[in-house]
Amino acid sequence: MSRVSQARNLGKYFLLIDNMLVVLGFFVVFPLISIRFVDQMGWAAVMVGIALGLRQFIQQGLGIFGGAIADRFGAKPMIVTGMLMRAAGFATMGIAHEPWLLWFSCLLSGLGGTLFDPPRSALVVKLIRPQQRGRFFSLLMMQDSAGAVIGALLGSWLLQYDFRLVCATGAVLFVLCAAFNAWLLPAWKLSTVRTPVREGMTRVMRDKRFVTYVLTLAGYYMLAVQVMLMLPIMVNDVAGAPSAVKWMYAIEACLSLTLLYPIARWSEKHFRLEHRLMAGLLIMSLSMMPVGMVSGLQQLFTLICLFYIGSIIAEPARETLSASLADARARGSYMGFSRLGLAIGGAIGYIGGGWLFDLGKSAHQPELPWMMLGIIGIFTFLALGWQFSQKRTARRLLERDA
């Protein structure tokens, strides 16, 4: 085995271990934020939505800067610093008794993610061969799902005692992850050239096809982020107990572990990436619309199952498309900018979703936010279809293994 192949194989194992620690640290805390502050402390959903949206927008919206800096200085210092900053954000969240302090903790958490997320994504593009990326992204998603349910179970158990224990556990996990990276991560360069920060950002902004694709995905993310805000609140309302939220993540884990990799392997042989992305988005949109009309937990979990199946189909295709469009001369900048759709869609999804949830509740129209989200998903589906049908983008966007 050549030294390059050996480095790639070792890099895969490193990425998987690192990803599991990050996912556990995140899901111990974040799925329970809406339960803690809306259900237990009686805050308006829009207040929590602002906090979650702020974290999302800062982490993903500023990702191009984090990626460009990582292109210049390397992945390791950015990743370690960002993870320590997120640990500080979680520690602050544990003592948040006023909205401004929750917002500040989410600000710290988001800034930390801005530093570590783009270089971690760029490492995947660097270490995984193009023809293997779709399957590796599927493995990461399976790991995400397993880590999500383990983290949510642990967080739900700790919440019975004290929310400060929840936040402390998340902070400790990110400190461990920072130490793991500081100790074992080599000083890898992300790009094929040592790209100046401004040049990497300029290269991305001039790539109109990539920019259009990323911004179009904002509608997709408006739906996807509801697993952190409105779906946990809905499960709690229908079940009457916060402990039921863990079953939502258990469903995701079971579906991902059993279906994600087989679906990815089968669909990559029979369907183009853009068709998989659009099919998954359509299923997610249609499953959202009836959520506000259900009154039983079984019906709600059935719709959540459909939503997760749509995500299982769409997400590996979306990740692979983003990676295939990245310029090797500025990988960090490209992967950072690819998060802008999540920044915009996530912020609108959290803040707008929280506002619509409160509005629907006060107007006795609980179906309002869910119908609106479904309609947004349909419009995004049509916008992606228009974009993929353009001859000027066909050669790049329809390339499965570029």
UniProtKB/Swiss-Prot annotation:
Keywords: Antibiotic resistance, Cell inner membrane, Cell membrane, Membrane, Transmembrane, Transmembrane helix, Transport. Gene3D superfamilies: MFS general substrate transporter like domains. Residues 34-98, 160-164, 235-243, 298-299, 361-367 are periplasmic. GO terms for biological process: response to antibiotic. The keyword Cell inner membrane applies. InterPro entries: MFS, MFS_dom, MFS_trans_sf, MFS_Transporters, Multidrug-R_MdtH. One of its GO terms (molecular function) is transmembrane transporter activity. It is a multi-pass membrane protein. PANTHER family: MULTIDRUG RESISTANCE PROTEIN MDTH, RESISTANCE PROTEIN MDTM, PUTATIVE-RELATED-RELATED. Pfam families: MFS_1. It is found in: Cell inner membrane. The chain crosses the membrane at residues 13-33, 99-116, 139-159, 165-185, 214-234, 244-264, 277-297, 300-320, 340-360, 368-388. GO terms for cellular component: plasma membrane. The keyword Zinc does not apply. Confers resistance to norfloxacin and enoxacin. Its main location: membrane. Residues 1-12, 117-138, 186-213, 265-276, 321-339, 389-402 are cytoplasmic. This is Multidrug resistance protein MdtH. Belongs to the major facilitator superfamily. DHA1 family. MdtH (TC 2.A.1.2.21) subfamily. HAMAP family: MFS_MdtH.
